[in-house]
Curated annotation (Swiss-Prot):
Expressed in the thyroid epithelial cells. It is found in: Lysosome; Secreted; Apical cell membrane. Its EC number is 3.4.22.38. This is Cathepsin K. Belongs to the peptidase C1 family. It catalyses: Broad proteolytic activity. With small-molecule substrates and inhibitors, the major determinant of specificity is P2, which is preferably Leu, Met > Phe, and not Arg. It is a peripheral membrane protein. The lineage of its organism: Eukaryota, Metazoa, Chordata, Craniata, Vertebrata. Thiol protease involved in osteoclastic bone resorption and may participate partially in the disorder of bone remodeling. Displays potent endoprotease activity against fibrinogen at acid pH. May play an important role in extracellular matrix degradation. Involved in the release of thyroid hormone thyroxine (T4) by limited proteolysis of TG/thyroglobulin in the thyroid follicle lumen. InterPro entries: Papain-like_cys_pep_sf, Pept_asp_AS, Pept_cys_AS, Pept_his_AS, Peptidase_C1A, Peptidase_C1A_C, Peptidase_C1A_papain-like, Prot_inhib_I29. It comes from Sus scrofa (Pig). The keyword Protease applies. The keyword Lipoprotein does not apply.
């Protein structure tokens, strides 16, 4: 995989500077690596044009990064033949209820006494299950919710267990399954349902099915949820430090996010008012002087840095990361 990334990141400023035979070779290698097949030659040609445009974007960005313009690098991945608009349409899924408003009953009020650690990584504490892949189903909200529940289950019982996002996709009537949803609706469902099944009991299929919840497969409960004060990164930091992994919403609509590879992600075009994707904050820290959040995505391990991204922290609520943050009570 690393060999592929090196090959695909050869500088290319324009197609004219990139011999067609090299592009042909890289295209075939990319298709083989990610097992890409197309329905027709016309479809493949259109997908290759998108891939070439993305490859050029990646190469130019990385040249700029080498000159100090950016704090992060990009790399070609399995989303290479998709536009950023297609990624948002098919692989995000945050849908905030029109009537959503924070209640004093569910507002997280931080305990400001005492210091929080300068960094924390719940992966190292055993609170985080392996990275999953939601596929082309708008179920990011389910994976984000499940991740937060898994962290609290570990904290309460000492056991790390994969919970079922499919259970939420199929059964949370307030959400729209693969058509999108919201995390607090998922937490409320688990509370009212008195449980959520394990992944083993209710496997993920990546499409809407009838609700098949079975109490015999129940692996966790929920007593409610708390929401972080809107846009307050200090409160979010304290929640992550004191509570555990937190469900967050971000703008994932940019090509720079689609092909993120390493470094601290900050794109001034990221719109904090355009929240479209739910992910999981599993920690925070500082890398090369840059404060960041450690974010677990649900696009598989081929995306980002083995499925994760470091997102800028305390940079004016970049990408809206603290606007719709919440966690379950267990």
């Amino acid at each position: 995989m690393w060999g592929l990334k090196v090959v695909l990141l050869l500088p290319v400023m324009s197609s004219a500077l990139y011999p067609e035979e090299i592009l042909d070779t890289q295209w075939e290698l990319w298709k083989k690596t990610y097992r890409k097949q197309y329905n027709s030659k016309v479809d493949e040609i259109s997908r290759r044009l998108i891939w070439e445009k993305n490859l050029k974007h990646i190469s130019i960005h990385n040249l700029e990064a080498s000159l100090g313009v950016h704090t992060y690098e990009l790399a070609m991945n399995h989303l290479g033949d998709m536009t950023s608009e297609e990624v948002v349409q098919k692989m995000t899924g945050l849908k905030v209820p029109p009537s959503h408003s924070r209640s004093n009953d569910t507002l997280y009020i931080p305990d400001w006494e005492g210091r929080t650690p300068d960094s924390i990584d719940y992966r190292k504490k055993g609170y985080v299950t392996p990275v999953k892949n939601q596929g082309q189903c708008g179920s990011c909200w389910a994976f984000s919710s499940v991740g937060a529940l898994e962290g609290q289950l570990k904290k309460k019982t000492g056991k790390l267990l994969n919970l079922s996002p499919q259970n939420l996709v199929d059964c949370v009537s307030e959400n729209d399954g693969c058509g999108g949803g919201y995390m607090t609706n998922a937490f409320q469902y688990v509370q009212k349902n008195r449980g959520i099944d394990s992944e083993d009991a209710y496997p993920y299929v990546g499409q809407d099915e009838n609700c098949m919840y079975n109490p015999t497969g129940k692996a966790a409960k929920c007593r409610g949820y708390r929401e972080i004060p809107e846009g307050n990164e200090k409160a979010l930091k304290r929640a992550v430090a004191r509570v555990g992994p937190v469900s967050v919403a971000i703008d994932a609509s940019l090509t720079s996010f689609q092909f993120y590879s390493k470094g601290v992600y900050y794109d001034e075009n990221c719109n904090s008012d355009n929240l479209n994707h739910a992910v999981l904050a599993v920690g925070y820290g500082i890398q090369k002087g840059k404060k960041h959040w450690i974010i677990k995505n649900s696009w598989g391990e081929n995306w980002g840095n083995k499925g994760y991204i470091l997102m800028a922290r305390n940079k004016n609520n970049a990408c809206g990361i603290a606007n719709l943050a919440s966690f379950p009570k267990m």
